[in-house]
C-alpha cells in the first residue's frame, strides 16, 4: 500500500514538473490569409508543445487593437505590420519585432473586369481593411507609383480581406487589395489583376511577429521557443505541400483545390527560409515615414527589431537542419 501511495505521489510530482515546464502564452494571428500559415502549421503539427509552450491562439484582426492587447499584457505575441509597429514605437510604446512573417507585399490589386490599369482607378472606390494596415500601405504604394494623388480616389475600410472581395463582387467598390487565398478567388471569379505585389512589388516587411521589449527581457526562453516553433512551422510549410495546404484549408475555411494550390504556391515562394525582418525593407520604410515625421529619422533598425533569437538559431544550424528534412 505504501509503495502504491509513493508511486502515485511521484507521478503527481512528475506531472507537476512537466506542467511547470509548459509556459502559458497567447499569440494573435491577425488576418485570414496564407501569410499566417507558419503559425497554423506550428499549431496543427504540435510544434508549440514540442518547444514547451502552452499556447492559446487568438484572432484579433486589427493590428492596432492587437498591439494594445499586447501592451496591456493580455497577449504576449502578435502578428503585425512593420509600419504599425514602428508607429507604435515612435509614439512611445514598448514594442519590438522578433522575427519575420513575410518580407513582401503578398497582395494583388484586383479590380472590376473593365479596369485594365492602375491609372484607371482615378475617381474610383478602393477597398482596404483599415487605414494604416498592410492593405492600405499596398494600395498607397501602387497608386502613388501610378501618379495618383490622395484626392484622385476614395478608400473604403471594410474590416477583413474577404469583405473586400464580397464588396467588389457586389459592385460597391471598383478595386481592392487582396491577399491569398482571396486574390485566387477573385481571379477565378473573373476579376482583373492589376498587379501582383508579391512578385512585382518592393521588399517590405508586411507581416512580422512582435512582442514587447519588457516581455522579451523577462522571458527570453519563451521568446526563443516561440521563434523556433515558428521557424519550424515555416520550414514544414515550405517543404511539405500537403501539410501546408491542409492548414490553409482549415483556418481559411477553403475547399476549392485550385485556390488552395495557388495560395500555397504564392506563399511558399514569398516566405524567406530564415525569418529575419528585412533590414533593407525597414530602412526603406523608415525613410518614407521620416519624410512626414522627422522624429522617425532617428530610429534605427535595432530600435524596433531584435533578431538575436533568429541569429542564434541560424548559428546553431537550426534552419539548415530543418530545410534538409
Each PLM stretch: what is its role?
Residues 287-325:
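Conserved C-terminal helix/tail region of periplasmic/extracytoplasmic solute-binding proteins
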Residues 5-15:
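Bacterial N-terminal signal peptides
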Residues 14-22:
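Bacterial Sec-dependent signal peptides at the C-terminal "C-region" and cleavage site
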Amino acid at each position: 500500500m505504501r509503495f502504491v501511495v509513493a508511486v502515485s505521489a511521484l507521478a503527481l510530482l512528475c506531472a507537476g514538473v512537466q506542467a511547470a515546464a509548459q509556459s502559458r502564452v497567447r499569440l494573435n494571428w491577425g488576418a485570414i490569409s496564407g501569410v499566417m500559415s507558419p503559425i497554423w502549421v506550428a499549431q496543427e503539427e504540435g510544434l508549440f508543445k514540442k518547444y514547451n509552450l502552452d499556447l492559446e491562439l487568438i484572432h484579433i484582426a486589427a493590428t492596432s487593437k492587437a498591439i494594445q492587447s499586447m501592451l496591456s499584457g493580455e497577449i504576449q505575441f502578435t502578428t503585425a505590420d512593420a509600419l504599425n509597429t514602428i508607429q507604435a514605437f515612435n509614439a512611445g510604446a514598448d514594442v519590438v519585432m522578433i522575427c519575420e512573417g513575410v518580407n513582401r507585399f503578398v497582395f494583388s490589386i484586383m479590380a472590376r473586369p473593365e479596369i485594365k490599369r492602375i491609372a484607371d482607378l482615378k475617381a474610383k472606390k478602393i477597398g482596404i481593411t483599415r487605414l494604416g494596415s498592410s492593405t492600405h500601405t499596398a494600395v498607397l504604394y501602387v497608386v502613388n507609383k501610378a501618379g495618383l494623388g490622395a484626392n484622385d480616389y476614395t478608400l473604403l475600410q471594410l474590416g477583413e480581406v474577404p469583405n473586400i472581395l464580397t464588396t467588389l463582387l457586389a459592385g460597391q467598390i471598383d478595386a481592392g487589395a487582396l491577399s491569398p487565398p482571396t486574390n485566387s478567388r477573385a481571379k477565378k471569379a473573373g476579376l482583373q489583376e492589376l498587379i501582383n505585389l508579391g512578385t512585382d512589388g518592393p521588399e517590405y516587411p508586411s507581416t512580422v511577429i512582435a512582442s514587447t521589449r519588457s516581455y522579451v527581457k523577462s522571458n527570453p526562453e519563451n521568446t526563443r521557443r516561440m521563434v523556433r516553433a515558428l521557424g519550424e512551422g515555416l520550414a514544414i510549410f515550405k517543404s511539405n505541400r500537403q501539410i501546408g495546404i491542409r492548414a490553409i484549408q482549415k483556418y481559411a475555411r477553403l475547399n476549392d483545390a485550385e485556390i488552395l494550390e495557388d495560395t500555397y504556391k504564392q506563399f511558399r515562394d514569398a516566405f524567406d527560409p530564415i525569418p529575419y525582418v528585412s533590414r533593407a525593407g525597414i530602412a526603406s520604410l523608415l525613410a518614407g515615414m521620416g519624410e512626414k515625421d522627422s522624429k522617425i529619422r532617428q530610429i534605427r533598425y535595432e530600435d524596433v527589431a531584435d533578431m538575436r533569437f533568429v541569429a542564434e538559431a541560424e548559428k546553431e544550424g537550426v534552419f539548415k537542419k530543418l530545410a534538409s528534412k
